[in-house]
């Protein structure tokens, strides 16, 4: 993988883009997307040359009530097929499985029975053994697999080193993900972490991906910084739609990448048709002061999300609440 390192303007044919609009964006609107929205997003991604499209979660119906969420919280096979048919396109279909929140043996069929190509296993650093078990199960079922270690900004250096070595050496995942869950990392930190991930991953023939959040308006900067180091699977969402402050903007990333296979125009047309009216309807996401503050203090954005829902604007008081500082 060392040969894939370069600078911000290097042409990298190994780079792949993952659209996470439905999955991360679903955390904003409870996964209540219309079929037209999903179908048009799928077609836009195909036309734009995007490599993977994440449809949502494989959530356990015994834990989450189907009546309380849109269908992309559960990603049933028939619902995906209603959008993509047999998916006779270069675009690959992905779903996310949360450790402890997915019944993998019941809800993840053999690849031969599914139009899904990739399962992304989401884990915290203290559940790595369970993530390895899930990753290996999905690999044995015939899927491409990633393992996404969340909230790494709160992990100790030795703890992270041990987790990465264990994951890289014992899992059958093709990708290990650097995830800035709190949007607290800066490009210099991302560069150091990406270098660490790559050095461990490449020992075992694996690659590295990145999933960034935009609390400090650094999701794009952090994504391309990781890319310049050699990270090759890049997550993005249309209009940055995602939990709280959102994610790296697809349109920013596609416009930046030096690869003629990518075409930004289909994404721009999708924004015109769907994202502008979605925001106008009152669906809220994106960087704001409260998300900036949780990012700067390396905290989960749940307090900022509650602040937003309450339509508060007392930012100084909020800062005191989350830090204890007057």
Which residues does each PLM region occupy?
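Catalytic cores and adjacent flexible loops of soluble metabolic enzymes
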Residues: 1-326
